[in-house]
Amino acid sequence: MYFNNELSNLKDHLLVTLQNNSDVERDRINFILWDLKFLDCFLHLKRLPFASECGMLEFSQKMIEIWKIQSHREPYDCPYWKEVIWKTKQEFRAEYSFPNTSLAANKVDDVSPKFVMEVIDVFVENLNVVVKINDPYSWLFVPEHKEQIEQVLKELKLLRFFVCFVSNKCIEPQYRHTTFYIHALIEASHIAMVVWLHLPVLNGIVNQYLAPSEVSRLRSDFMEMKIKSIQPDISRNNIYIDVLQALKSTIPQAQNKHAVESGIVETPTQNLTVGLSDQMVNLQEMLCFLRDNLIHLPILDLEFHLQDMDSVIVDAGLLIYSLYDIKGEKEDTVLDNMNRALGFDLPRNIEPIKAMVYLVMQKAFQSNLPRVHGLGYVDFLLKNLKDFQGRYSDSLAFLKNQLQVIQTKFESMQPFLKVVVEEPHNKLKTLNEDYATQIIRKAYEVEYVVDACINKEVPQWCIERWLLDIIEEITCIKAKIQEKNTVEDTMKSVIASSQLARTPRMNEEIVGFEDVIETLRKKLLNGTKGQDVISMHGMPGLGKTTLANRLYSDRSVVSQFDICAQCCVSQVYSYKDLLLALLRDAIGEGSVRTELHANELADMLRKTLLPRRYLILVDDVWENSVWDDLSGCFPDVNNRSRIILTTRHHEVAKYASVHSDPLHLRMFDEVESWKLLEKKVFGEESCSPLLRDIGQRIAKMCGQLPLSIVLVAGILSEMEKEVEYWEQVANNLGTHIHNDSRAVVDQSYHVLPCHLKSCFLYFGAFLEDRVIDISRLIRLWISESFVKSCEGRSLEDIAEGYLENLIGRNLVMVTQRDDSDGKVKACRLHDVLLDFCKERAAEENFLLWINRDQITKPSSCVYSHNQHAHLAFTDMKNLVEWSASCSRVGSVLFKNYDPYFAGRPLSSHAFSISRILLNFKFLKVLDLEHQVVIDSIPTELFYLRYISAHIEQNSIPSSISNLWNLETLILNRTSAATGKTLLLPSTVWDMVKLRHLHIPKFSPENKKALLKKSARLDDLETLFNPYFTRVEDAELMLRKTPNLRKLICEVQCLEYPHQYHVLNFPIRLEMLKLHQSNIFNPISFCISAPNLKYLELSGFYLDSQYLSETADHLKHLEVLKLYYVEFGDHREWKVSNGMFPQLKILKLKCVSLLKWIVADDAFPNLEQLVLRGCRHLMEIPSCFMDILSLQYIEVENCNESVVKSAMNIQETQVEDNQNTNFKLILIEIHLFYLFDMKGIESISTDMKEKKLTVTRDVDADEVQLVVEKLRNVAYADEVQLVVEKLRKRGML
């Protein structure tokens, strides 16, 4: 908007003229708009005498006449008009001078602060345009003076802040400060006039029109643009002092103008150019801290302290501006004179400023902390405080006493925090959790203050004061706890820590919908001969996925189909990932070629399904386009193939339907609702009659929605079975949950113990519909300090208890359990729960997702995001943009990848990810998924506790030991580095906090240096994929890791002078996987691991003597897997009585075993026997008939005699032993078809039934797929024979 109507009309006419001329570039138009905007402002000042006296109005009118001529002249000649404008402004420059009129002569009663700010805003806007121009051909390009103009722009903004501050704080009539406002107008106008007069710059002809002296004066104009004095006879500082003293006399009431305060603080600090004492230097430092932190203070805190801040700002301004007019005296004299003249005592007046600076810094930090915490954070802090004081003793010397007191205080609170974790649900629990939260927040503050001290980011006086306050606050918290005797009262009711997971495991058996299940089952098994889509739709939480999975796993259904495959789509999906998921189910994991393009995978899926009857489950479809993508892969050959599809949307269900109408899944009826609630709360038991009425009322309140019912059941199952408590739940639920499933989730979250809230919200960091690996989840929980230590139990065991508790509350769904011990291996969250976790985590400053299409920019909300505990990114560009704004973030979780970066080293790009990560100075967890390759490990981030990433290098820098907090190091290798041995520096053994080290095929870099080192990794629990070529190397590494629980390693012909040297593994070792790279070489050591439960040997040459001697050292072994093993002693294995007393699972795959002799009591506790590819084995020993614990035998690709013996065992187990739970699975892959054929026509597979059928004449690509499949599921010798026959036929 223009102030002057004539100029506005001229602007419109010029634009029309120029836009009709195709030769006029946009840059020229921008310059015209820029120039006219300045002229408009200059004319707006015509009522002020100074505008006429300095020539501003006259110059403006002449320039307008030139533009009028331009607007009527054709054709438009850019170079000519640029020269005309330049010459005209050159003439103006010769006549223009700084306004020297008196301020009194310029007083105009209606000059308001609003008017002043409007003018300054226009000038700022126009100068912003100039500093952003980098094109040397632009008319607005400033080649040599951009830095000076940026300083000018800063001064203008500060002046505007000052005007705004005075205007907002002044309760007197504004005319009292007219002198100040006129002064601001004159200075701003002069700045704008100087810049306007020097643009545009003529490229290459500057010197033609400017003499060297003029160029020098031009530069001088810019260099002197910092505001010095308004005129020779009047001091600008006197004007400022007068207005500040007027403000000081009466401070106005608080207003929501915190941005003004943060801006005005910068004004005095910019002008401290005179010599100052040390105290004044401190004042400048304090005002800088006040400026930097003030804008981050929440409005409520700001309003509460606004009057004090106003007073501090005014006093600081008075102190500084009073010094400007005093020159030529010594500093001490200056200060004395100033104190006497103005009644100031500088040291005494600095104290309130210091107090306000500290208060603002403290409040700004505290108010933006995450509101959900892990109780293990105090454990982490206590360890770090000791390390900090050792590593940074010089920096922290003056804090030694305070830190020791704080350490003692936190240690004294550890028993209380343990009580909070272990106590049951009772009336004191909420109060205790509040105290625990206060303690954790103090721990966050200590960490920040100590780091700020080390890095000299906060002044020493502030740090000392902050720590003293922390000590006082912790003392106060402890006193409150002791006063209420909460520890003693609660300890009486503390249950054993083993009862953390006391809630019965979630019963995954479906309840209700019996009529719906029967209807759908009939549609799947009967109906049309053609392909049919059975689609279900309905609102979230109805149980669509649960019902679909029930049908998909129903034996009476599955047995009628050759192939079964499923995929979960979700709102954001990858077409290729869906195809891969379906192919893995259809043909097996080992046969899927992930490197193929999506179109090739789609064609492979179609050919796989073409001749077979298939059952496909496509879950959670959001759009019709998903069905368009997938439907072409599902051929219809009139063999009653079926597809189950679930969606929230009726339109999608209808779009995908073929013959059957879409099924709208109904709500539960009242009977089903109560039946489900009762089942989830009481398991196989019945509800007490006293609770039945209130229980049925609660079930009815859940709105007949299954998800709501199971969530409420999770709440009830954790409470005392008393009517009083159930009434409380009913009252809290209210009536609104009928239409709001989030209300039920919110209630479930509300009653969670504080140590589980952070664990639950952390699920929000995972992508929708993703299966979550439990080992990885637990490692992350521990690294995030969610898990509170407990003497006598490992953190992993405690975390498993947390998980089982969440499962028992029906907040987490189990997707896979371990066959041997029943522990959860994988889980997922319902979409409704996942959405809740993401939303609530953002509200609590706990977790923030930065998505590819993120609207909010980092600059708009820096501090709130800076304080989030965790950030999840889905795009590398987001990571770059946000890194500078998130220095205090504790975790960076990268959940997707830009294809440009996937699988490639970032060092070759314009920026490196390691350099970007250095901005996250408090980073504790770095979890990079999907093959994001880091160019180097960020060894400067010493807070890091968890790293998971991909690397391409074949070595790790020795500086890795700088990460002295690191507990988990997971480095995957890119395809380019696969197979190469990675060299691990000896400094890794100095990283004594390491708990998990996972690196494919690594070896110590300097074994001699490692041998000399006395350091050990006593905390290391899992070690994956070291590579050994000598027994001595293995022994050395095992000595360095005495507390290992899991070990996976690769060996190559370990040489040792004695054939059966005993290799002593750590006493706590529970899982061992040994793989030999050179297949069928003898194993040169005997395994001794007294507590080993899981042993897997692959690629070795073994005999009965070796296995017998090894078994003597493995009396607690529960799982034994022998893969690709060559048996000596004429391919015979003798198992004597008592060799494997605790063995539960025995798997033999592709072993050259011919004769198997087993004593009657060799496997007294065996539950599962799996034989795959044992084509030389004659039979399964008959003693397996009498093993009463046996539940399962699987035979795949073995001789008929083995199959027959398995069937005999089944008959005896079921009929004679009455073992009704016994199962026999026979899997057959017909390799012999390939040996007798002269050609091949077609290939089909059924991995569900484990059948392979091959006929004649197909192309070589399909044959190659079959061969790859055989290599994964069949015996190696026969596959090689098949390959040779195919080569001879010219097919490979």
UniProtKB/Swiss-Prot annotation:
ATP binds at G538, M539, P540, G541, L542, G543, K544, T545. Pfam families: NB-ARC, NB-LRR, WH_DRP. Its main location: cytoplasm. It comes from the Eukaryota. One of its GO terms (molecular function) is ATP binding. This protein is encoded by the haplotype C genome of the allohexaploid Solanum demissum. The keyword Nucleotide-binding applies. LRR repeats lie at residues 842-865, 920-944, 963-991, 1066-1089, 1094-1113, 1114-1142, 1163-1187. Residues 1211-1278 form the HMA domain. GO terms for cellular component: cytoplasm; membrane. It is a peripheral membrane protein. Residues 505-792 form the NB-ARC domain. Keywords: ATP-binding, Coiled coil, Cytoplasm, Hypersensitive response, Leucine-rich repeat, Membrane, Nucleotide-binding, Plant defense, Repeat. It is found in: Cytoplasm; Membrane. The keyword Mitochondrion does not apply. Residues 394-414, 505-526 form a coiled coil. InterPro entries: Apaf_helical, Disease_R_plants, HMA_dom, LRR_dom_sf, NB-ARC, P-loop_NTPase, R1A-like_N, RX-like_CC. Belongs to the disease resistance NB-LRR family. Confers resistance to late blight (Phytophthora infestans) races carrying the avirulence gene Avr1. Resistance proteins guard the plant against pathogens that contain an appropriate avirulence protein via an indirect interaction with this avirulence protein. That triggers a defense system including the hypersensitive response, which restricts the pathogen growth. This is Putative late blight resistance protein homolog R1C-3. GO terms for biological process: plant-type hypersensitive response. PROSITE patterns: HMA_2.
